[in-house]
Amino acid sequence: VNLAAALARTGMGVMVVDIDPQGNASTALNIPHTGDVASVYDVLLGEMEIQDVVQDAPDVDGLQVVPATIDLAGAEIELVSLVAREQRLSRALEAYTAWREEDGQERLDYVFIDCPPSLGLLTVNAFVAAEEVLIPIQAEYYALEGLSQLLKNVQMIQKHLNPRLQVSTILLTMFDARTNLAVQVAEEVRTHFPEQLLNTAIPRNVRISEAPSY
């Protein structure tokens, strides 16, 4: 969300696609996403096009949002029986790009897809549609296990569905340099992913946790 807003404020055309049933990205960008709002759920099921559901972020010029709703919680079950279930989002984005061109609108510079913290069909749809994966990882031991599983899934997607997909960026979050564990996690990630790990880390800070409530 912060990356998307920052890029939009430089004058770039940016869109955030929220496919997390919790809808935190939609909330953070002040986008309505109650159950009666047209959303990415309708797009994935083929009932609407992206241009029918996309909204302008009220607080950031040049930033568009395809919101999530709680309906996404059951979307994975509904998607199982659909044709090309792993490619629903990819095809919708391609159609939206073509529509923008026909409508005389400029091509978007960036599309961010906010995924749920799981590796189901929603996340697979994101991987098939994307070119790059940005992984935020908490500086905690169990996060390393999650990273390992995520990378296996990325490799599977590369092999079978999207060969252009690559892990381009890993960002350490909730990093506390005063703890040995955080330092060890950072060193472990840096050893295995020296090119992908950013030098910048987001520190553990209670004010960051409190910020969404304001």
Regions found by a protein language model. Give the residues of each.
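P-loop NTP-binding core
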Residues: 1-214
